């Protein structure tokens, strides 16, 4: 149930206490890159959780950009809070907390199949999801590792910047659970895709874009001189 990346250093990554739901590889498309038709990013995605709409979900994702491109250094989501640097297993990650999109979330059918069905019928999903993202770049910024932990947002919390009475410690407790959800170790041999793939066909690849990955930039020709 451990994903081993091809990045340098190679990392062995997994969720600690959640069942493996599936692992797959595919192509993400970054449409705001300026590349004709969008920039294709080789992507390895592993998902952990029960997928019952009420239990946590954990994501291990590895994206590799083509030669001539690099991941930008800004690794936060719009409207995110509590941005900072977290260390997991001796590896530093930029972290932030945010509420996932209800309509453009690649993982909604995996974490909440009922909510995805309701959304497909032009309804409103019954739950919102809170996420803590950890991200870092490797191999001269050509590889990006994203770890993300999610839980359903309690119904009484309508804003993560103005918590209701009695909920002052909720976000801090959630972020602690997120920090403890992942195991990260340095692996001896890089081997992207070493985990046997198990189908997670419900993953909505059309939303595996800048919303999840963040942005990229091309190297200027002067950078190569």
Report residues per predicted region.
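Conserved polar/disulfide-associated segments of primarily extracytoplasmic proteins
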Residues: 27-170
């Amino acid at each position: 149930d451990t994903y081993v990346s091809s990045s340098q250093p190679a990392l062995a990554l997994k969720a600690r206490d959640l069942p493996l739901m599936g692992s797959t590889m595919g192509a993400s498309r970054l449409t705001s890159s300026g590349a004709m038709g969008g920039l294709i990013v080789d992507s390895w995605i592993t998902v952990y959780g029960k997928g019952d709409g009420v239990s946590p979900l954990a994501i291990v994702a590895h994206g590799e950009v083509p030669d001539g491109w690099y991941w930008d250094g800004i690794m936060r989501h719009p409207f995110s809070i509590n941005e900072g640097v977290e260390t997991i297993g001796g590896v530093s990650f930029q972290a932030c907390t945010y509420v996932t999109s209800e309509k453009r979330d690649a993982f909604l059918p995996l974490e909440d199949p009922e909510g995805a069905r309701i959304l497909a019928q032009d309804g409103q999903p019954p739950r919102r999801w809170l996420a803590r993202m950890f991200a870092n770049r490797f191999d001269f910024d050509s590889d990006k590792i994203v770890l993300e932990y999610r839980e359903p947002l309690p119904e009484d919390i309508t804003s993560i910047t103005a918590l209701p009475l009695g909920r002052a410690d909720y976000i801090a407790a959630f972020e602690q659970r997120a920090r403890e959800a992942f195991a990260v170790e340095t692996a001896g041999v890089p081997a992207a895709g070493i985990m046997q793939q198990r189908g997670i066909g419900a993953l909505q690849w059309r939303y595996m874009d800048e919303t999840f990955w963040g942005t990229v930039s091309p190297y200027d020709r002067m950078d190569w001189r």
